[in-house]
Amino acid sequence: MLEALDLAGVRGERRLFDHLTFRIVPGECLSVHGENGSGKTTLLRTLAGFATPAAGRVLWKGKPLRNQWSEYQRELVYNGHGIGLKEDLNALDNLLAAAAIAGEPVTTECVESALDEVGLAEHRHLPFRMLSQGQKRRASLARLLLYRRKLWILDEPSTALDQFGARWLGELIHRHQSRGGMVVLTSHQELALKTSQTVRMGA
């Protein structure tokens, strides 16, 4: 269970959000909406433990993040605005390297299977810089298939995806929820999601 208790977030001297409280339990998806600059990314980074709230607390399984940082990171996948993969490596080697850094024991066969699901099997040996932005985004999202993590925090995961890719992403999130996973996301693109809760920033 992920809880936000009376959270406040700032950027510089500007307060982006205040007194934000919610709770997400297994099987739920929290969708965060708001205009650009309303604090969506700040909120997601705070929930991931990468930013310190101006006030309030984030709890995981009833305990503050600071008391269980390493354990929390092993149960979390954070997919931010950036792709987070190296331009000079191919998709296969990128995902193998990323999994090793994340401490996930995956085989080449597992990575190839994930690339096949995201439609990149034929491009797995191409240098990453030669892929389109949509293909790069799909390669980045393939990590969700490889990492067995309970909580997904996804910042605009549908960016650069076409209609097919967005539909696949919605189905993937639904599968994760059906297995007891939790999701927090922002998206400008309409996704077919079983959303349990909505937070509107700047309202």
From Swiss-Prot:
Any Gene Ontology CC annotation: plasma membrane
Catalytic activities: heme b(in) + ATP + H2O = heme b(out) + ADP + phosphate + H(+)
Residues at which ATP binds: G34, E35, N36, G37, S38, G39, K40, T41
Class of the enzyme per the UniProt entry, highest EC level: translocase
EC number: 7.6.2.5
The keyword Nucleotide-binding belongs to this UniProt entry's keyword annotation: yes
Places the protein is found: Cell inner membrane
Keyword annotations of the record: ATP-binding, Cell inner membrane, Cell membrane, Cytochrome c-type biogenesis, Membrane, Nucleotide-binding, Translocase, Transport
UniProt protein name: Cytochrome c biogenesis ATP-binding export protein CcmA
The organism's taxonomic lineage, starting at the top: Bacteria, Pseudomonadati, Pseudomonadota, Gammaproteobacteria, Pseudomonadales
MF (Gene Ontology): ABC-type heme transporter activity; ATP binding; ATP hydrolysis activity
Gene3D superfamilies per UniProt: P-loop containing nucleotide triphosphate hydrolases (3.40.50.300)
S-S pairs: none
Primary localization class, coarse: membrane
One of the GO biological process terms: cytochrome complex assembly
Quaternary assembly: The complex is composed of two ATP-binding proteins (CcmA) and two transmembrane proteins (CcmB).
Chain's role: Part of the ABC transporter complex CcmAB involved in the biogenesis of c-type cytochromes; once thought to export heme, this seems not to be the case, but its exact role is uncertain. Responsible for energy coupling to the transport system.
Domain ABC transporter: 2-203
Topology term for the membrane: Peripheral membrane protein
Sequence similarity: Belongs to the ABC transporter superfamily. CcmA exporter (TC 3.A.1.107) family.
